[in-house]
Amino acid sequence: MGRNAKIISKSKIRRVNILILILLGTQDNSFHRLLDKVQELIDKKVITEKVIVQAGRTKFESKDMEIYSLMPEEKLREIMEKSDLVITHGGVGSIVMALKMGKKVIAVPRLSAFGEHINDHQIQIVDSFNKQEFLIGLTELDGMEEALAKAKEFKPKKFKSETDHMIKLIEDFIDNN
């Protein structure tokens, strides 16, 4: 097989130059603000990559993005595995899933001021992961273009889940007692 050959997986998701996966979470409130910014950057040709979105309950239409409300976890994991960049809301589950796969992540917290969440706890979550250099945290969407440029060279610290460590300790305890 030549270097330029394209491999098509069983699910027909082709490897293109770069794939961006966007996760908005399953919160009842809309997070269209993030998709509005992504669409703006697509229109300006800042984003030229294929974009796949799991939008949750956010209603958004775009001819430039492949948008799903929800997808089975297996399909989500398959797409995430193929992605080069994950742009996600500030939910721990989405962030940790991407980090465990070694993905570059831009995390954008949902904000109560925009009616995206009931409080601003996602700011603290994103800030914590950002300070530890696991991801690029972004509270102001005006900085998205800069964050995308930074992501090209960004080398996230390797994420090790403490949950995995605790499970191993419990398994060792059970096996040895």
Name what the model sees in each region:
Residues I67-L70, L135-G143:
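Short acidic-hydrophobic, aromatic-tinged amphipathic segments that line or gate anion-handling sites
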Residues N29, L70-E78, H89, E116-D120, ...:
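Residues at secondary-structure transition points
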Residues M1-I18:
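N-terminal amphipathic/basic-hydrophobic helices that include classical n-h-c signal peptides
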Residues I18, Y68-R77, L85, M101, ...:
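Catalytic phosphate/metal-binding cores of nucleic-acid and nucleotide-processing enzymes, i.e., regions
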Residues K104-T139:
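Catalytic binding pocket for nucleotide-activated donors in carbohydrate/polymer assembly enzymes
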Residues R3-I8, K150-N177:
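C-terminal amphipathic helix plus adjacent low-complexity
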Residues I13-K82:
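Donor-nucleotide binding loops and adjacent catalytic segments primarily
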Residues L76-E116:
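A donor-sugar binding/catalytic signature common to diverse glycosyltransferases
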